[in-house]
């Protein structure tokens, strides 16, 4: 309880503070639902307060459903993708991307002209420099007979362009994409996913016909992505962020008259259905850009435009979002598949396939004529990408609206989702938030059936937590994503550096995907002899088709310039070697890379209540970790280092993510082992009764008392004399009496709570019992500075609400927050009453507004 209160009134969660940012509706004055909640507490006559504006943030678990509905306006419903991703849950909990900056690289955007892209949330990055090569942005358009030349560029030519839409250079694509990421929530037309985020737009210097085959200039995109990444890093700090890349089209070939694996015409498109075909596209890039397989740092020393994307983010916590492609192919094109050939890039990459609505309400399907996850499944999600309504511009800069489809429309839903999730997890970096999005993704329809397209190409039905070779992780879920990771994808170091901050994870955290990946990695290593040979017969050289690369007049040399050979094969095998080494690294130390591991760092408090089965270790290096017995994974051991604190709870009243009262099912099973280094602390909760296997102190014994397991009604009952005391126990069943585990408990068990004292703290053998009672002479009213604040304090103390629990569990180092909170409630409540937003205004006036 105590930690909820600390964070509720801090910038970490932005609630119960004067700025009250989460309650703002775009274009309207901010209103305080907290003031209304207090009004409800104070109206003993039965009159109820009501928040009349759409879009109010829930203040407790009973309000969440209503709060969700309040955000599901006609504006929200214009983009069905918001419903598919359950975005209203995030909004209802107060998370809309505010405080986070998201990047968009596209064909510019009609900023500060289009009404949904106006305001100081929107800004631009720039690309300035000289082209480093000779090439063509639209090679597929070069046709001597038709007299079309595409969009050529020459080495040494200067470029200087920013993210504003430019007539004659850009099309409407970037304007549509930017609207989906974060278009204004203003009561008209539609709004974007992360409508609270700041958006920085970069410019590809072209239209959506820009070809993302091996044709773009490295120097241009190094400058463009570099400036955008730098601006994101400046805005978000070390947390980094995301850059959405929906732009472009794939490599074309002379029509081969073939079809994709779902039966759609793909004859004019470069095929990427098999390993050999994706490897060919890699080798085609290698030939055109001159990859050097002997470079000291491996093949990533190339100068392709895709490497420029990686180069811009590799030393920052920034993620590049890439579309898989709009063709009926089993795999993504190279841009999205890049980490397959450079494993170091994987943590910086998200690939996006497309989703559409099914025929039945609440059902969804993979768009089968788009590229699927395939070999890139470990970094792929599927997102709404069919008939998406958003902002547009015509050829002359006149704003409008239209519904479009494509993976181009899917990717900005992911960028927006990342913005929302980064506002929820404000102490995680973007790479960690990416993992949260992956591991909480959804593949179920509203009726609980699997979405069409979840089943693998070979018919395997992937179980929950596994990854599909068609949909990847599934669809970003801004409901489940509010409640912590679903899996740890390796070592998860969570640094909660903000003193007094809180996070609560109630999701079950498993090891399922890592188990699946290990099996598949092992199979690949066997098939390729540890990455030393191809997993198939011979490479595709390209001799059986002709790439439309725009190279010239159709001479024999031009028609064969795409053909690869032994040099490119050697480069491919160098990439295989890098992949093999990455797998070997994960196998080291007893397959540590395939075991999800948690390291809690920083001064804040993390509470875990899920039924967790991650396979790795749990370490507390700093701050406090509180958990249910079933929340520590299959290792069943917690290591507490110097400065860290750990405690076990039998219940927890979650008013952070509004889950309400949660109860442990294994509090008495006695399976946890707790190992505490010198300087570490065991937390004993006065409202919990728990049994662990054992506790080992490797130095001085330190104890701290907690009231985290108590709900507001229990604290209020003790505080108001309706109940004598709160009593909890902690037993270590396999410690022996001679261990004298709790011999100094009474000396250590001092209360640093404002409203409660330790009545009794005893240690007998391997069991400790703690009883806490109300501190004599203390009242909530004594922290009030005005008569109005005293009335509010009295109402809070009497109510037994979640707010009561948060205040009554205050510790001494937080005491100033009590007065600040009462003052804030007084100000907000006064303003709310004056604006006639509370039913029974006469009662409100008598209660609060009297001089």
Feature locations, PLM:
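Gram-negative bacterial Sec-dependent N-terminal signal peptides
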Residues: 1-4, 8-50
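Outer-membrane translocation/initiation segment of Type V secreted surface proteins
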Residues: 6-11, 427, 439-454, 458, ...
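Acidic glycine-/aspartate-rich tracts in secreted/extracellular proteins
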Residues: 23, 107-111, 205-207, 248, ...
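Subtilisin-like serine protease catalytic core
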Residues: 51-67, 78, 88-220, 236-240, ...
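Substrate-binding/access-modulating region of protease and related hydrolase catalytic domains
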Residues: 97-98, 164, 169-172, 184-187, ...
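Extracellular S/T/G-rich loop segment that most often corresponds to the catalytic His/Ser-adjacent loop
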Residues: 106, 126-150, 338-419, 423
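Hydrolase catalytic cores
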Residues: 178-181, 187, 202-208, 385-467
């Amino acid at each position: 309880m105590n930690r909820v209160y600390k964070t509720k009134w801090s910038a970490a969660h932005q609630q119960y503070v004067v700025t009250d940012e989460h309650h703002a509706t775009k274009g309207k004055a901010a209103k305080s639902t907290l003031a209304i909640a207090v009004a409800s507490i104070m109206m003993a006559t039965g009159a109820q307060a009501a928040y009349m504006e759409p879009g109010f943030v829930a203040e407790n678990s009973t309000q969440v459903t209503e709060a969700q509905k309040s955000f599901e306006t006609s504006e929200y419903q214009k983009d069905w993708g918001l419903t598919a991703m359950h975005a209203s849950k995030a909004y209802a909990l107060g998370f809309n991307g505010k405080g986070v900056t998201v990047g968009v690289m596209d064909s510019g955007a009609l900023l500060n002209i289009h009404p949904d892209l106006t305001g100081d949330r929107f800004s631009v990055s720039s690309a300035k420099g000289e082209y480093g090569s000779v090439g063509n942005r639209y090679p597929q358009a070069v046709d001597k007979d038709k007299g079309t030349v595409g969009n050529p560029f020459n080495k040494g030519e200067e470029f200087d362009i920013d993210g504003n839409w430019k007539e004659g250079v850009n099309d409407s694509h970037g304007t549509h994409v930017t609207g989906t990421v974060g278009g204004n929530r203003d009561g008209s037309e539609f709004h974007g996913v992360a409508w609270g985020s700041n958006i920085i737009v970069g410019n590809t210097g072209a239209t959506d016909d820009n070809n993302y085959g091996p044709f773009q200039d490295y120097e241009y995109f190094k400058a463009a992505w570099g400036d955008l990444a730098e601006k994101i890093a400046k805005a978000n700090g070390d947390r980094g962020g995301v850059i959405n890349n929906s732009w472009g089209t794939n490599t074309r070939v002379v029509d081969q008259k073939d079809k994709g694996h779902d039966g759609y015409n793909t004859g004019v498109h470069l095929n990427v259905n098999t390993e050999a075909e994706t490897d060919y596209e890699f080798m085609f890039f290698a030939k055109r850009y001159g990859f050097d397989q002997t470079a000291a740092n491996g093949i990533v020393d190339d100068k392709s435009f895709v490497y420029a994307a990686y180069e811009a983010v590799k030393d920052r916590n920034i993620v590049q979002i890439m579309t898989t492609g709009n063709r009926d192919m089993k795999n993504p094109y190279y841009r999205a598949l890049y980490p397959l050939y450079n494993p170091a890039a994987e943590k910086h990459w998200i690939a996006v396939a497309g989703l559409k609505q099914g025929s039945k309400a609440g059902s969804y399907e993979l768009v089968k004529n788009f590229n699927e996850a395939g070999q890139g499944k470990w970094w792929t999600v599927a997102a709404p990408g069919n008939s998406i309504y958003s902002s547009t511009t015509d050829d002359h800069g006149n704003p409008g609206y239209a519904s479009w489809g494509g993976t181009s429309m899917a990717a900005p839903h992911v960028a927006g989702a990342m913005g929302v999730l980064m506002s929820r997890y404000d102490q995680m970096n973007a790479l960690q938030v990416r993992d949260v999005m992956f591991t909480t993704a959804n593949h179920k329809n509203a009726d609980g059936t699997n979405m069409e397209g979840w089943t693998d190409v070979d018919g395997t039905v992937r179980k929950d937590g596994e990854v599909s070779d068609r949909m990847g992780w599934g669809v970003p879920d801004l409901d489940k994503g509010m409640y912590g990771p679903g899996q740890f994808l390796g070592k998860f170091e969570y640094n909660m550096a903000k003193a007094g901050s809180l996070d609560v994870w109630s999701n079950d955290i498993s090891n399922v995907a890592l188990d699946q990946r290990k099996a598949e990695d092992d199979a690949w290593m066997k098939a390729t002899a540890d990455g030393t040979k191809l997993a198939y017969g011979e490479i595709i050289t390209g001799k059986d088709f002709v790439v439309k690369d725009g190279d010239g007049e159709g001479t024999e040399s031009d028609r064969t310039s795409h053909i690869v050979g032994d040099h490119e094969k050697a480069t491919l095998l160098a990439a295989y070697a890098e992949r093999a080494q990455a797998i070997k690294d994960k196998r080291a130390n007893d397959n540590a890379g395939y075991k999800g591991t948690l390291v809690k760092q920083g001064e804040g408090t993390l509470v875990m209540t899920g039924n967790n089965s991650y396979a790795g270790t749990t370490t507390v290096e700093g701050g406090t970790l509180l958990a249910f017995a079933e929340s520590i994974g299959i290792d069943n051991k917690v290591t507490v280092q110097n400065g860290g604190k750990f405690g076990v709870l039998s219940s927890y009243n979650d008013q952070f993510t509004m889950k309400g009262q949660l109860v442990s099912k294994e509090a008495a099973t006695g399976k946890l082992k707790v190992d505490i280094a010198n300087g570490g602390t065991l937390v004993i909760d006065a409202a919990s009764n728990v049994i662990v296997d054992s506790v080992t102190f490797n130095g001085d014994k330190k104890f701290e008392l907690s009231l985290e397991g108590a709900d507001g009604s229990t604290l209020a009952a003790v505080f108001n004399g309706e109940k004598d005391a709160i009593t909890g126990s902690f037993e270590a069943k396999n410690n022996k009496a001679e261990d004298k585990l709790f011999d100094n408990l009474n000396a250590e068990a001092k209360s640093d709570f404002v409203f409660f004292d330790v009545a009794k703290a005893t240690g007998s053998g391997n069991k400790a019992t703690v009883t806490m009672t109300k501190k004599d002479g203390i009242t909530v009213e004594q922290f009030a500075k005005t008569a109005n604040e005293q009335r509010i304090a009295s109402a809070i103390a009497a109510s037994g609400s979640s707010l009561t629990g948060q205040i009554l569990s205050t510790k001494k180092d937080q005491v100033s927050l009590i007065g600040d909170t009462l003052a804030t409630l007084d100000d907000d409540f006064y303003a709310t009453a004056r604006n006639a937003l509370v039913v029974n205004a006469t009662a409100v006036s008598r209660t609060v507004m009297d001089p």
